[in-house]
């Protein structure tokens, strides 16, 4: 112990966090939370989009539908689900054999981080006919 002015006993080493350390920790927590709030909804939305696309692909392959019918069904389902994208813009048909159709889902989603800084999520998945066979609604 160090004897301070006015006869107080002061510790010779600081214990605990300083004000600067606490402020830095709060800023880091806020930045991590903000990044999480920008990324997590995009990931959840992509999961739902991929799941609905796989189920529509399963139905289309079971009914041996054409690419045009498949994309029409996907657009109808996405409209019901409130998806703003059009299937023609984000879905590419890899194999268009009726009953064995495979597709590639590819798109970007940008979320504002702050000011003019955006977080861009790029998604690219291929759903084969085999993958679609096990799809559930």
PLM regions with names:
Residues 21-36:
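Hydrophobic membrane-insertion alpha-helices, especially the h-region
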Residues 112-137:
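Low-complexity, S/T/G/P-rich flexible repeat/linker segments used as non-globular hinges
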